Amino acid sequence: MLAISQDELGGPEVLKATTVPQPDPGVGEILVRVRAAGVNPIDVINRQTGQLVGQPPFILGWDVSGIVEAVGLGVTLYQPGDEVFGLLPFPHGHGAYAEFVVGPARGFVHKPDDLGHVQAAAIPLAGLT
């Protein structure tokens, strides 16, 4: 799958398109096809300093909106095809700047039909602060 990753700390110029393995959902997790990912000040800080995520390489992004592709064992609230948005576990569950992301089902909610993916991806972390 395609992802926006970085191999060094720095400004936006360190972000690059790369190919990485597609993750698989584990117990209690869902695989989401990303339609939009939020960009927050903490993403910029981590891109520059690695403050919460450590040293590169890594894929940033905590806020995500998309479509459920697969569910892990024990997930009953979501099915493939459901539109969802949510917050990946903060601070270590980053990775929304990719075509697909895996996260705990409990970190997502169903996206209302009248809310676009771009708008939905802007809500999670900002809604907590």
At which residue positions do the language-model features occur?
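Extracytoplasmic/periplasmic beta-strand context in beta-sandwich domains
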Residues: 18, 82, 98-99
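Glycine-rich beta-strand-centered segment in the early N-terminal region that forms part
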Residues: 21-38, 48-90
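Cytochrome P450 core scaffold surrounding the K-helix E-X-X-R motif
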Residues: 42-45
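NAD(P)H dinucleotide-binding glycine-rich loop of Rossmann-like/cofactor-binding domains
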Residues: 77, 87-129
